[in-house]
C-alpha cells in the first residue's frame, strides 16, 4: 500500500495497527459487505484487509521511479488502484499525464489499473488551506489513459447531485476507470 502524503501514511498505519484514535472506516467496510452480499461481518472484512497489507510505502507520482530506487515492493504489479491522487497532486493536465505515465511503470504488461478520481474539481479544503486540483473531464481521462498505453475496459462517471455538495470542494462528479496496460508497453 502506498500514499503520497506522510500524514496519510501515518493515519493508515494507525488503522493497520488498530490503534486508538485511528480513523473509523467501518461505515465503508459495512457498505462493501452489503454490496458483496456474502453475509460477512465488516470486522471480518477489515481483518482480511489488514492481513493483506504488508507495508505502507511512500510514493511520489511526479518521479519517474515513483517508489524510489531500491524499493522493496514486488514489481511489476498485476494491478494498481489509484484513488483521488493524480488529479489532487498535479498542478496541470501535463503533470497529470506524467504522473499517470510514472505509475504505469509499476504495472506489468497486461496488468489492470483502477483509476478513481474527481471530475472537474479545481480546489478542495484541507483544514483552513484551499488546495488546487487539476480539473479533468471524462474525455481527458480517456485520452490520458490511451497515451499511457492503456486500453480502457470501462469508464463510468457519477454526477454529484447538488444536495450532496458539502462546500469542501467544487467537485462536479467522480470517475471510475478500469483500464488494462497493453501488452508490450
Which residues does each PLM region occupy?
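SAM cofactor-binding core of SAM-dependent methyltransferases
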Residues: 1-21
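S-adenosyl-L-methionine
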Residues: 16-69
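Short alpha-helix
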Residues: 36-48, 132-149
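A short acidic, Gly/Pro-enriched loop at the edge of an enzyme's catalytic core
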Residues: 64-80
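A short glycine-rich, Lys/Arg-flanked "PGG" loop and its adjoining helix->strand segment in the class I
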Residues: 73-74, 94-109
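Acceptor-substrate binding/catalytic loop of class I
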Residues: 91, 121-142
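Conserved beta-strand signature within the Rossmann-like core of class I S-adenosyl-L-methionine
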Residues: 110-118
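Core SAM-dependent methyltransferase catalytic element
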Residues: 148-185
Amino acid at each position: 500500500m502506498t500514499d503520497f502524503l506522510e500524514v496519510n501514511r501515518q493515519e493508515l498505519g494507525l488503522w493497520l495497527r488498530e490503534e486508538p484514535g485511528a480513523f473509523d472506516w467501518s461505515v465503508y467496510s459495512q457498505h462493501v459487505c452489503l454490496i458483496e452480499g456474502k453475509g460477512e461481518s465488516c470486522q471480518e472484512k477489515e481483518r482480511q484487509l489488514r492481513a493483506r497489507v504488508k507495508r505502507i510505502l511512500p510514493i511520489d507520482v511526479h518521479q519517474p521511479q515513483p517508489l524510489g530506487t531500491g524499493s522493496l515492493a514486488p514489481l511489476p504489479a498485476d494491478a494498481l488502484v489509484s484513488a483521488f491522487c493524480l488529479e489532487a497532486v498535479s498542478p496541470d493536465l501535463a503533470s497529470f499525464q506524467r504522473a499517470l505515465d510514472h505509475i504505469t511503470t509499476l504495472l506489468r504488461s497486461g496488468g489492470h489499473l483502477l483509476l478513481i478520481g474527481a471530475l472537474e474539481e479545481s480546489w478542495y479544503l484541507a483544514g483552513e488551506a484551499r488546495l488546487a486540483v487539476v480539473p479533468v473531464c471524462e474525455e481527458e481521462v480517456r485520452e490520458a489513459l490511451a497515451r499511457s498505453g492503456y486500453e480502457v475496459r470501462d469508464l463510468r462517471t457519477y454526477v454529484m447531485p447538488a444536495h450532496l455538495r458539502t462546500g469542501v470542494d467544487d467537485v462536479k462528479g467522480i470517475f471510475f476507470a478500469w483500464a488494462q496496460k497493453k501488452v508490450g508497453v
